[in-house]
Each structure stands twice: as C-alpha cells, then as structure tokens.
Amino acid sequence: EVIEKEPDGNLLVLTSSLEGHIEDKIQEIDRQTGEVVNELIMEDIFGGKYEDRVDWTHLNTVSYQPETDTIVISPRNLESVVKLNWTTKEIQWILCDPRFWEGTEYEKYVLQPEGDFVYQFQQHTAYQMETDLDGDDQTIEVSMFDNHYVKVRKSDVLKYFDGEKESYLLVYAVNEAEKTVKQIKKIPTVWSTITSSAIYDADSNHIFGMCGHVKDSEDKRRGMTYEFDYDTEELINQFSIKSYYYRASEMKIDWNDLAAAMEIKDNYIMGELYQPVKATWFFWQKKPEQVLEDGEITLHLTGQVLYAGAYDHQISQIIFHGKKNT
C-alpha cells in the first residue's frame, strides 16, 4: 500500500525488508527527492518474539494521524491492529483477542474489551475513522474488514478461533485514555478468506464490504461487493464478478478533469510485449526458464499506456527488449 502522509505530502509505503522476511517494513519517502526519511521494520518493535517465517507479519494497511503523529497498521498474520508513534516508534495500543499476546511483554498494550465481541482474524483495511459514529468525544473509531480466517499452521490461534465461515465489517470505539474498546458494529458478509476491504462513506452513511476472495460461492463467482445502510444494516446493493480481486476503493469522479484533453508527450519508449518470466521469493533468484501462466499476469497496451497486472505476485521490474539489444 502507498498513501499520502498528508495531502500532497510525503508518501507512506508498505514494503519488504528482504532481510529474510517480506511485507514487514514501513517507509516514509520524501515526495520531492525520493529519499527515505523515516522507516520501521516490524522486528524492531516486536523484538524477534515470533515464529521465524518469511511472512510472519504481513502488513496490509497503514494510515497516519497528523494531530498525534501516529500510524495505525494492520499486521494481518499477528491477528492485530497496532497504533504507534511514528517518530518514537512507541506502541500506543494493540487491538486483538487478548489471548494472542497473553504472557508476553506486549500484553500490557492490548485494549480491554467491553461488551460482546467477535474478534478479527486475518483482517484487512484497518483504519482510524474521521467520523464520530458513537457520539462519544472520548473515543475514536476504527473500521476494518475481518476476513475471519485462520491458517492451519497457527495451532495456538486455532484453539480459540470460533470457526465461523463468514466475514464481517467491523467498527470499534477505542477509549485511548482508559485503554478499552467496544465493538459498535458487526455486519456479516460472505466468507472472503484473504484480501478484501471495508469502506465507510460519511456522505451517505453507508458502509461497503468488498469481498475479494470468495471461495465457496454457489455460482462460482469469486468477487462480491455489498453496500449497507450503516444504522439499519439494510442491504442496499450487491454486486458480484467472476474473478478474484485484491480490494476495491471508492472513486470520487471529477468529470471536468476527465473531459480535459490528455497531454501526450513524445518521449515514450515503444517496444514489443513478452510474457514475463517467473521469479522466486526474492528478485535476485530469477529462473528465466519458468514462464508465468496467462492467468497469473496480464499485459495490455491502451494508446501509449502499458498496464501490467499480477495475481499473487509483486512486479518489481519490467524489462523492454528491443532490436539490436536495445
């Protein structure tokens, strides 16, 4: 994920340390110079207290709160949402089932639940919200898409996972002063085991569930999108597509901007399109003899713009091969 730290400001980027692990690093990049001005590797805050797997944390979202200089991150494989100070890297709180961190030095950061709860598992798009949904100025709200899925390898988590085969749109009210949390909204959706997103639209007071990886649908349609009234939880719209997708985002369309003529520059490098080669986990271990299947990556040219898409792969480089080895 790449977001603006503030409008037209620096960029916050989720990336990989490649120090034996992937999807475990956050960088702040100066928008003008491209220089990395701040960064965090997850091992630095959790001190190696994890099972040493390549993708032990799996960061999937980050947001920044300028008024407190804090970030909210979603390390999916820790079944947790974490808020920390971006300058000092000090943990503010952790939102998860308290049993996950029980008996560790991080137990003190876990928010204490009030009322009924369905805790998240393998969540995506965990963000601090701008809208006050509970009418309490002493709390902040956090929304997320709860995939509600646990991989078999996580034997300890499986002991308290409820086994429900449905996902949820969740909203929590967090009292940061008292270190408590209430679950103020839980809307079930079709079971989407990975990817996916939740979006609240303040203008309409609607909440959207973007289920990007539906495995057990009767009609074999893999992507499902829901639109609910936030207050009544009434289903307003529902759309499905044949293929999986990573996540969906709301689009605010500026029709005047779209109607303006597109500037066409004369410095495009034109060439032919070739099917990419398959790489292993790390980009320096390429095996050119392995070719990705057509369903795993797509290339198409629209005018002078090349679009590249990949399923479950990260594209780190595109190489154009022209005549006479150019």
Where are these regions (language model features)?
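Intrinsically disordered, low-complexity Pro/Gly/Ser/Thr-rich segments with frequent PxxP/GP/PP motifs
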Residues: 325-326
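Histidine-/acidic-rich catalytic cores in large beta-rich domains
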Residues: 1-320
